[in-house]
């Protein structure tokens, strides 16, 4: 399998600062390690601070699989991520 870079953009129901506290928490770090995701970048839009981008790397298909799990969706929504606004694009280098 090849390495895949997955770009997520989405809206927040809370502030970016509140969301970042959750995203950068030790619990989320442990979750990422358990499922094999490596976060590369997270940031907010200069135009709309409630619009966020997150870039992950993992083995091909892992990110889409993890983020389509109903339990994962429930947990990320609890942190302020409005799942229905999520746009996902995937990229490979080969």
Whereabouts are the PLM-identified features?
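Short S/T/G/P-rich N-terminal loop/turn motif that feeds into the first structured element of a domain
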Residues: 1-73, 82-94
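Short, exposed beta-strand-loop hairpins at the edges of beta-sheets
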Residues: 77-79
């Amino acid at each position: 399998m090849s390495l895949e870079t997955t770009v997520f953009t989405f809206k927040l129901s809370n502030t970016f600062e509140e969301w970042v506290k959750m995203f950068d928490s030790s619990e989320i770090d442990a979750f990422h390690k358990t499922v094999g995701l490596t976060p590369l970048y997270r940031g907010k839009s200069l135009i709309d601070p409630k619009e966020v981008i997150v870039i992950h790397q993992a083995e091909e298909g892992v990110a889409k699989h993890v983020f389509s799990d109903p339990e994962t969706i429930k947990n990320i929504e609890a942190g302020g991520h409005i799942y229905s606004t999520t746009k996902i694009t995937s990229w490979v280098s080969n």
